Amino acid sequence: XNNIVFYSLGNVNSYQGG
């Protein structure tokens, strides 16, 4: 997809593009 999920990991902001 074209779906992008943003999630906070500890103090690090990570993003996963699906």
Curated annotation (Swiss-Prot):
Residues spanning the signal sequence: none
Key words of the record: Fimbrium
Subcellular location per the Swiss-Prot or TrEMBL entry: Fimbrium
GO (cellular component) term, any one: pilus
Note: This is an alpha-galactosyl-1,4-beta-galactosyl-specific adhesin.
Protein purpose: Fimbriae (also called pili), polar filaments radiating from the surface of the bacterium to a length of 0.5-1.5 micrometers and numbering 100-300 per cell, enable bacteria to colonize the epithelium of specific host organs.
Name by which UniProt lists this protein: F7-1 fimbrial protein
Organism phylogeny: Bacteria, Pseudomonadati, Pseudomonadota, Gammaproteobacteria, Enterobacterales
